[in-house]
Amino acid sequence: FNGLEGELPEDVARESIYKTLALKGDKTGPVIGIVPITEHLSEKKLAKISGNKKVQMIPQKDLQKTTGYVHGANNPVGIRQKHNFPIYIDHSAQDAGFLIVSAGEIGRSIRINSQELADFVNAEFADIKE
């Protein structure tokens, strides 16, 4: 299903679907932010929490060579296994108890306990939405 528009399964709320965004910090290099698809990532907040002055989205043409995934398929588990990039999950996922993220292929997603995902990928919960 398309998370942004159209019908969703009855037990799926649009705000429980999260996008995994890859950015580049001016001091740390790549940094990953995970926010609801219905929201926008605050680059300013992510920069501050990750120890950067600024962060910017990694251009799509560089995404696969940086994360190992194409646009729309970034998976936090795979990114953590291949790279040691810092990962930040918006705190709304912690409050909700679970989230749905890409499973590493376009059109495939997994529903997972928020805390278990954070523990597994060594992520930090933070306020990173605009």
Briefly describe each language-model feature range.
Residues F1-E130:
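Extended, low-hydrophobicity, polar/charged segments
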